């Protein structure tokens, strides 16, 4: 699934100049919920102040910047891979797929995708991986903010559907509280069953049934 919008392309200085999108993900480590990715093409004529790695920003600041990015970027797209896709493909491949979906969801086709990290998804667009790119490239910073805020919103909705797990507090990460609630309430439909703590609970449940 991809969510996208864009403004009109205000044009770069020459037809030969690369149209660059930044790409980043959010949610590889959690035990529950989808993994998200975002792609952003910034408008060089409409700079956005304060872009940096989303992890270094407060929730309030991230949310404010996400609004600015969506309003001022030339094009942006948010995509995800479900828990089922994560369990079927593994988290690395699911993350790569979410990134590719995000890039493909852009209304303006980039000529170069700058990817945060050390791996690039397989896609038609030329791509370059940049380690710690979310701190070095503003378009990647913007993508990290959109991916993070979209995932946090999704986990808020999961908290409404499954309040016993306190997703609003830990966002699905394997905190002591989350593990305690997992042991108490069992595995929900939105947990990643291929992840070790979740798989161990499922294996224990099967073993207990056989006794």
Curated annotation (Swiss-Prot):
Top-level taxon of the source organism: Bacteria
BP terms from Gene Ontology: DNA replication, removal of RNA primer; mismatch repair
Keywords: Cytoplasm, Endonuclease, Hydrolase, Manganese, Metal-binding, Nuclease
Xref: CDD domains: RNase_HII_bacteria_HII_like
Cofactor note: Manganese or magnesium. Binds 1 divalent metal ion per monomer in the absence of substrate. May bind a second metal ion after substrate binding.
Cofactor(s), by name: Mn(2+); Mg(2+)
Disulfide bonds: none
EC number from the UniProt entry: 3.1.26.4
Domain RNase H type-2: 18-207
A cellular component term, taken from the record's GO annotations: cytoplasm
Binding positions for a divalent metal cation per the UniProt entry: 24-25, 116
Pfam families according to UniProt: RNase_HII
Keyword Nucleotide-binding: no
UniProt xrefs under PANTHER family: RIBONUCLEASE H2 SUBUNIT A (PTHR10954), RIBONUCLEASE HII (PTHR10954:SF18)
Similarity comment: family membership: Belongs to the RNase HII family.
Purpose of the protein: Endonuclease that specifically degrades the RNA of RNA-DNA hybrids.
Protein name: Ribonuclease HII
